[in-house]
Amino acid sequence: MRILLVNYRYFISGGPEKYMFNIKKMLEDNGHEVIPFSIHSNKNVETEYSKYFVEPIGSRDATYFEECKKTPKVIWQMLTRSIYSTEVEKAIKKEIKDVKPDLVYIIHFVNKLSPSVICGAKKMGVPVVLRLSDYFLLCPRFDFMYNKKPCEECLTKGYRTCIK
């Protein structure tokens, strides 16, 4: 099976990336072909598929948003990549068209690639598996915490409660 593996980093920076490279190896050891889709970074593991990767928010040297210079362009990119990115959708559709995966497996896309990776895959008719390892779909902070206390207001009152 050809699997397009989507993550917003293609280098180890923490747990999700360790998981990604471990699952990639396990899948390959079991006879599957695993093809990455990610963001350009100077820290990326080399891959022939980097030609499909999208430009990062800010700089290819920055791993975290805090490392980026907060220009209006960077802030705009951060806001739009949180919601939707035509650039990302176009790039993933191009890679899907060229490599013809049987499945898209998404590890992490939040705030860097956007949900457009899901839309692009669905528009191309490729099934999507989305790994959920935190609460990002339900809580903008990812952890249901506010002022070091449990908070579930987004579940009952919606996202507007996170803007106080």
Predicted features by range, described:
Residues M1-Y49, K97-V99, V117, A121-P127:
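N-terminal subdomain of nucleotide-sugar transferases
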Residues R9, E87, F109-K112:
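Short beta->alpha connector loops
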Residues S13-G14, K43-T47, K112-P115, F136-R141, ...:
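Short catalytic/ligand-binding loop motif for oxyanion handling, primarily in non-cytosolic enzymes
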Residues S13-G14, S82-I83, H108:
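Residue-level marker of alpha-helix boundaries and capping positions
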Residues D29-L103, F144:
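A conserved catalytic-core segment of Leloir-type glycosyltransferases
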Residues C68-I75, L132-K164:
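Acceptor-binding helix/loop patch of EC 2.4 sugar-transfer enzymes
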Residues K93-L113, P127-R131:
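Short N-terminal targeting/anchoring amphipathic segment
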